[in-house]
Amino acid sequence: KEGYPMGRDGCKISCVINNNFCKVECQAKWRQSDGYCYFWGLSCYCTNLPDDAQVWDSSTNKCGG
């Protein structure tokens, strides 16, 4: 599984071309994962996630309230 990790506010975690920052963010939530900064979305994107990982989903987006 892969997807955008969420911050406490339910929003995607923003980044500006900083793969190491995103890798740390992903691994803080899911130890075996990897991550990078998705350039077009300017958001962190995680890979190698467990099937039950909760990631940002446009259909259940609660970002911004």
Swiss-Prot record:
KW Calcium (keyword) present: no
InterPro entries to which the protein is assigned, alphabetical: LCN-type_CS_alpha_beta_dom, Scorpion_toxin-like, Scorpion_toxin-like_sf, Scorpion_toxinL, Scorpion_toxinL/defensin
Tissues where this protein is expressed: Expressed by the venom gland.
Similarity comment text for this entry: Belongs to the long (4 C-C) scorpion toxin superfamily. Sodium channel inhibitor family. Beta subfamily.
Described purpose of this protein according to its UniProt entry: Beta toxins bind voltage-independently at site-4 of sodium channels (Nav) and shift the voltage of activation toward more negative potentials thereby affecting sodium channel activation and promoting spontaneous and repetitive firing.
GO annotation, cellular component aspect: extracellular region
S-S bridge residues: 11-63, 15-37, 22-44, 26-46
Protein name as catalogued: Putative beta-neurotoxin RjAa4
Organism: Rhopalurus junceus (Caribbean blue scorpion)
